[in-house]
């Protein structure tokens, strides 16, 4: 069994994002290419975005710090600390309204 402090990791990654030229930092918390389930902690400086992209599989976004805006077509969802957003199965983008940290959980599509 492995235990990870998401609070400590969020602080660490947000510090990196704030000083990074692209305003973001990310770390895989669980999973990787050899797993179907992947959890990634993503820190974004206020005003930064994850540009529109395809949904990689079933996914959720757990907002740990700050405020974010998820866009999928005409639909939008606001996220604040403690919110869990079910990611729709379509192209989407994410805007960081404030300095933010999210935990992205994805189960990759197997193409079955």
Predicted region positions:
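A short, N-terminal "cap"/entry segment at the start of jelly-roll beta-barrel domains
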Residues: 1-36, 71
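Conserved short histidine dyad/triad with adjacent acidic residue
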Residues: 23-26, 38-55, 89
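Short, charged/polar surface micro-motifs in flexible loops or helix N-caps
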Residues: 34-37, 45-49, 67, 109-110
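Glycine- and acidic-residue-biased ligand/ion/polar-headgroup-sensing regions
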Residues: 57-73
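A cytosolic small-molecule/anion-sensing beta-strand core signal
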Residues: 64-65, 80-81, 98
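Short acidic-glycine-tyrosine-enriched beta hairpin
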Residues: 73-90
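Ligand-binding loop in jelly-roll beta-barrel domains
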Residues: 89-112
């Amino acid at each position: 069994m492995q235990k990870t402090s998401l609070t400590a990791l969020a602080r660490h990654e947000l510090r990196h994002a704030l000083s990074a030229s692209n305003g973001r930092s990310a770390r895989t918390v669980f999973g990787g290419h050899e797993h179907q389930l992947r959890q990634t902690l993503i820190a974004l400086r206020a005003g930064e975005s994850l540009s529109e992209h395809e949904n990689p599989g079933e996914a959720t976004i757990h907002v740990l710090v700050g405020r974010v805006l998820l866009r999928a077509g005409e639909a939008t969802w606001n996220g604040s600390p403690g919110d869990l957003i079910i990611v729709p199965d379509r192209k989407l983008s994410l805007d960081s309204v404030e300095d933010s940290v999210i935990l992205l959980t994805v189960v990759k599509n197997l193409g079955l």
